[in-house]
Amino acid sequence: SSDYPLRDVYKRQSLNPVVVTPGADATAGARLAEELAGSFQLGAGQFCTKPGVVFVPEGSVLEEALPQHVGGGAAALLTPSITAGFDEGVRRLAATEGVSVVAGRLDPSGPDAQAHEGARPVVLAVDASTVAERPDDILTEVFGPVTVLVRYAADAGGDGLARALDALEGSLTATLHAAPGEPVEPVLRRLETLAGRVLFEGWPTGVAVNWAQHHGGPWPATTSAHTSVGATAVRRFLRPIAYQSAPAGSLPEALRDDNPLRI
C-alpha cells in the first residue's frame, strides 16, 4: 500500500442540457419528442448522460407531442435509496412555484408506496424566467426517469434563453438541435463552457468507448476533466510534469530528441 493513495475521481451531478431551436422544433418537433422520450427513459433514467433539462420554444411541437411517448409501468431503480431519492426529488420539483407536470404522473406519496411500485417516468415544465430567478430550486439533477422542459420566448431576441443557460452549472454533455442556417453561435459558445462533450442533432445517453470519446465536464459534473469512458480515461490517474532546460540524459526516453522509443 502507498502512503499517498490515489485521489478520488468521481462524477457528482450532470443535467446534460439540450437546446431545441425554433427552427428545429418547427421542422422536427414530433420526431424530437419521440427521441427525447427514449433518451431520458433509457435504463429507467439512470444514465449519467440522461438529458435532464430541455430548452424548447414556447408553444413547442415537441412539448405537445411528448406525452404520447411517456408512460408505461413503474421501473425498478438500482437501490431503494435511489428510488426514495427519485420520489423526493420529483415531488420537490413539482412543488416549486411555476412548475407543472406535462407528461406521466406522480405516484402516491410515502416510502412504502414508492419502494413497492418503483419509478414512473415524469416530464415537468417551467418558464425560462422562473429558472433564471430560482435556478437552485429547478436546476438540480434527479436521478431516474424525469426531465424538465424549460420554455423560452423565441421572439425576445434570445435573452430569456441566455439567462436560463447562464444559470446552468457544468455537465458531462450539452446538445443542440437546430435547423440549417439558424444563427446558433451565441448558444453554442455558451454550451461549450458548460460541458465536456457537445452534441449536434443527437442525444447524449449513448457513450461510445473509443479514442475520440470524452467523458468529463466542468464542476460539478466531475472532479477531473477525464473520468471513466474512452481511451483517455486513464489520464485521470496521471499528473502532468514539465521539464525545463533538462539535459537529454535526465529526460524520460519518450521526451528525448533522439527518440529511442521510436514514438
Outline where the language-model segments fall.
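C-terminal core of ALDH-fold dehydrogenases
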Residues: 112-119, 157-251
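Active-site PLP-lysine loop of aminotransferase-like
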Residues: 11-12, 34-54, 70-75
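Flexible, glycine/charged-enriched surface loops at secondary-structure junctions
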Residues: 44-47, 51, 75-84, 100-105, ...
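Short, small-residue-biased leader/transition segments that mark boundaries at the very start
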Residues: 3-10
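NAD(P)-dependent aldehyde/semialdehyde dehydrogenase
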Residues: 8, 56-172
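Short, solvent-exposed loop/turn segments at the edges of secondary structure
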Residues: 12-15, 35, 47-50, 118, ...
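Long, acidic and serine/threonine-rich low-complexity regions
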Residues: 17-20
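Extended hydrophobic packing segments that form well-structured cores
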Residues: 251-263
